[in-house]
């Protein structure tokens, strides 16, 4: 073994198929400065899908079905994040409060059936002004691994329901209102990651003016709050045909050291992990080489695996 370096091989117990060789400097060499703190044994690169739904809401299938697809596609970890119940009303696409026990049971069942795949317990929660107490109540009900925060409503206006809804709107004004709510969601510190950041582009209604400063202002709020944002492949399956968020948005996020999660926003099991090769390439092009992993609301950063 040379005096300047030696090779150590790290094997992840949770992703046995992945093996990585890391070069470690000699004891006399200066320690490198890491952009993000890394924990031992997490030099192993991973692909993690933290956004998927079930038949309890507006999806199909159950967590076991999502897990089966994830294994087929070579994912290293997944998280179920069905739509959480709203505090004061029921809809066709949110769980009822009485569904929570069933949902948690389904996730536990998937964990038992697929022990080789880490499956995390999460929720996607709509941020609505005044929801804070309800989200805190939800947090105390079960040992959640993470919460995704989303903005689907601007007042009573549904952000992602139809192009017809947008056709009569002042688009720039609606985008500004959306990001005002998005900043509030970040500053609430109720969420671990914010899903599909530029959701208003879904139907290709985009601002006519330069929104760089709006994006930067929103992302500063995220950075100050210590929240992650999601890189979502769902937009590739929508009229916008684009990953959420846009490249300029994600580059600003990287400059501000905002961490990321990956998500497919799968509403059918077949979409779990869809286009994750493109997502990984896109994230790397914007400067990212790490993604978030959550356990019991605690975050760590792991290397982003290339596909």
Predicted regions and their residues:
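Mid-to-C-terminal alpha-helical segments outside catalytic/metal-binding sites
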Residues: 271-307
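Hydrophobic residues within beta-strands of alpha/beta enzymes
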Residues: 78-80, 147, 194, 229, ...
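Compositionally biased, intrinsically disordered low-complexity segments enriched in Pro/Arg/Gln/His
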Residues: 7, 11, 19, 31-40
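Short acidic/histidine-rich active-site segments
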Residues: 83, 197, 258-273, 293
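Extended substrate/RNA-proximal surfaces in nucleic-acid metabolism proteins
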Residues: 91, 97-225, 306-307
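Conserved, mostly hydrophobic/aromatic
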Residues: 51, 70, 147, 196, ...
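Short terminal hydrophobic/aromatic SLiMs and anchors at protein ends
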Residues: 5, 12-16, 25
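An N-terminally biased module of ancient metal coordination in phosphate/nucleic-acid-related enzymes
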Residues: 40-129, 203-213, 217-218, 233-236, ...
């Amino acid at each position: 073994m040379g005096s300047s370096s030696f090779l150590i091989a790290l094997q992840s117990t949770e992703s046995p198929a992945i093996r990585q060789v890391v070069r470690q400097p000699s004891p006399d060499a200066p320690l490198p400065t890491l952009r993000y703190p890394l924990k031992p044994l997490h030099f192993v690169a991973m692909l993690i899908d933290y956004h998927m739904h079930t038949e309890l809401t507006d999806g199909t299938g159950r967590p076991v079905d999502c897990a089966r697809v994830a294994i087929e596609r070579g994912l290293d970890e997944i998280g179920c994040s069905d739509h959480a119940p709203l505090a004061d009303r029921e809809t066709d696409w949110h769980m009822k409060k009485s569904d929570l026990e069933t949902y948690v049971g389904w996730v536990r069942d998937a964990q038992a059936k697929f022990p080789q795949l880490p499956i995390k317990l999460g929720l996607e929660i709509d941020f609505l002004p005044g929801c804070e107490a309800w989200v805190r109540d939800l947090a105390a009900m079960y040992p959640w691994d993470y919460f995704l925060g989303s903005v689907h409503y601007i007042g009573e206006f549904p952000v992602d329901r139809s192009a017809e809804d947008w056709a009569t709107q002042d688009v720039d004004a609606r985008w500004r209102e959306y990001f005002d709510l998005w900043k509030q969601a970040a500053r609430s510190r109720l969420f671990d990651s914010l899903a599909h950041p530029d959701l208003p582009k879904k139907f290709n209604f985009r601002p006519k003016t330069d929104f760089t400063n709006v994006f930067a202002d929103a992302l500063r709020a995220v950075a100050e709050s210590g929240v992650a944002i999601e890189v979502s492949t769902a937009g590739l399956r929508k009229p916008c045909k684009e990953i959420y968020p846009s490249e300029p948005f994600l580059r600003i996020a990287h400059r501000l050291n905002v961490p990321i999660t990956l998500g497919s926003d799968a509403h059918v099991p077949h979409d779990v992990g869809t286009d994750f090769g493109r997502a990984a390439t896109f994230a790397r092009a914007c400067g990212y080489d790490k993604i978030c992993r959550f356990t019991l609301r605690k975050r760590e950063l792991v290397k982003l695996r290339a596909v």
